[in-house]
């Protein structure tokens, strides 16, 4: 899987306007594969990614049901809520480690760096998490679960200088390559599912498989 990452001059702070400038210029990627058994509830999940001079910008859009958000502070287990995730190595070399950036529909964040696989994760400190410009269209807490159809967006701008504190970074510019995958999950809801952008060949849901990452090609 390859996603083309366009540069947009003067890109604003993260926003939820999926079909308005500048996001309207970005082609969405579909998070349309799944792990484990095919879920009964298969929310349509798309993601857009772009870059500007000092940050990479990501925006997810989910046509969902059975939505909840109970994790309230950074590094809580947001994967148990209605959640989207961006796992990435900021370069082509997987041996440099990878980040997992997870956000529930209410905008609560889990952000770790993994040098040596899943068990060797490092929590990104709160002062660094706060440097991400975050946005979300739903309230921070959703409890009880919303069973009716609802479309939600979350997004963030990731400063590339922040990433370089943890590993080498291939600066976003034409011909730069990163490795990545995008995910959608909802482990603790009434209709759990584990969706992926790039296919992951594993019998059980497990997003921590960087060897299955696709490519982000900057232009």
Regions from the PLM with identified roles:
Residues 1-219:
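Structural preference for beta-rich elements and adjacent junctions enriched in aromatics
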């Amino acid at each position: 899987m390859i996603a083309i990452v366009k540069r947009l001059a003067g890109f604003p702070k993260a926003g939820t306007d999926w079909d308005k400038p500048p996001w309207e210029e970005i082609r969405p990627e579909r998070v349309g594969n799944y792990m484990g058994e095919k879920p009964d509830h298969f929310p349509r999940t798309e993601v857009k990614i772009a870059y500007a001079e000092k940050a990479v910008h990501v925006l997810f859009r989910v046509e969902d049901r059975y939505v909840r958000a109970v994790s309230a502070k950074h590094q809580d287990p947001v994967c148990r809520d209605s959640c989207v995730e961006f796992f990435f190595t900021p370069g082509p070399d997987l041996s440099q480690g990878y980040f997992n950036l997870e956000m529930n529909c209410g905008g609560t964040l889990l952000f770790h760096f993994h040098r040596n696989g899943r068990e060797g994760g490092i929590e990104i400190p709160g002062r660094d998490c706060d440097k991400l410009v975050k946005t979300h269209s739903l309230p921070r807490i959703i409890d009880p679960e919303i069973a009716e159809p609802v479309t939600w967006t979350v997004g963030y701008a990731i400063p590339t200088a922040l990433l370089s504190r943890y590993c080498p970074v291939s600066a976003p510019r034409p011909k730069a390559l990163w490795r990545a995958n995008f995910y959608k999950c909802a482990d603790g809801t009434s209709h759990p599912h584990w969706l992926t952008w790039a296919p992951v060949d594993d019998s059980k849901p497990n997003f921590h498989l960087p060897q299955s990452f696709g490519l982000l090609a900057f232009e």
